[in-house]
Amino acid sequence: MAKQCEICGKKPLVGNYVSHSNIKTKRVFNPNLQHMRNQFPDGRIKTITICTRCIRSGHVTKPSIHKGS
C-alpha cells in the first residue's frame, strides 16, 4: 500500500493549483507518511508506514530498546 497510512487509511487527495489569473491545474496533496517500527500488543515488532497525525495521537507503540552485553 504505497502512499497510504496503515492505521487510518489516509491517502492522497486531488486538488488544484490556482494561479493569479485563476487558471486551475490539477495537483496531488500527499499525506505526510513516515516509516516507524511498531510493537504490537502480542510482542511482535514490524515496520509500518503511518501518517504523522497517527504518531502524534499515540496510535503506535515504539519498541523498547534492549542493549546487548
Curated annotation (Swiss-Prot):
GO MF entry, a single one: structural constituent of ribosome
Keywords: Ribonucleoprotein, Ribosomal protein
Gene3D superfamilies (alphabetical): 2.20.150.30, Ribosomal protein L28/L24
Annotated S-S bridges: none
Keyword GTP-binding listed: no
Biological process, per Gene Ontology: translation
Cited InterPro entries: Bacterial_rp_bL28, Ribosomal_bL28, Ribosomal_bL28/bL31-like_sf, Ribosomal_bL28_bact-type, Ribosomal_bL28_sf
Pfam families: Ribosomal_L28 (PF00830)
Gene Ontology CC, one term: ribonucleoprotein complex
PANTHER family: 50S RIBOSOMAL PROTEIN L28, LARGE RIBOSOMAL SUBUNIT PROTEIN BL28A
Matching NCBIfam families: L28
Assigned protein family: Belongs to the bacterial ribosomal protein bL28 family.
Name of this chain's protein: Large ribosomal subunit protein bL28
Gene name of this polypeptide: rpmB
